[in-house]
Amino acid sequence: MVDGKSAIARCADVAKFQSLAAIDVPGTRAIVNPGGTNERFAKAHFKQAQLIAYPDNVTIFDQIIKGKADIMVTDGSETLWQSKLHPELCPINPGKPLQFAEKAFMLPRGDVPFKEFVDTWMHQLKATGEYDQIVDHWLK
């Protein structure tokens, strides 16, 4: 699955945050969960925006809804999922991520038959359109 970092904000604020440059301005409060790729991305790209470290991944999006933060940058797939859970939040350009990443299955090293099985299974899912149906069901 092709993915990458994308932003999520209150739906009313989406127009303000269409690019990294638009996010990284004084006065923007970007919330991050400490210790992962989201924090690394924010620290690398946001020099003027205020970074707010928030340790609870379960309620971090509620902080945006409550107005305690303006935006979060996370995986594009997560912005789609969270916007389904929280209709007040909207993903910002998840189809055009701020950087490129791919999702993968972790498989046992050296288990070639199992890897070939998974590769065939994924190929069939994509060829039949079932993969897109699954993504649409869960993320769109």
What does each model-found stretch correspond to?
Residues 10-29:
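Flexible hinge/capping segments at coil-to-helix
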Residues 1-6, 76, 80-123, 140:
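Periplasmic-binding protein-like
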Residues 15-18, 52-66, 101:
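Short helix-initiation/N-cap motifs at beta->coil->alpha
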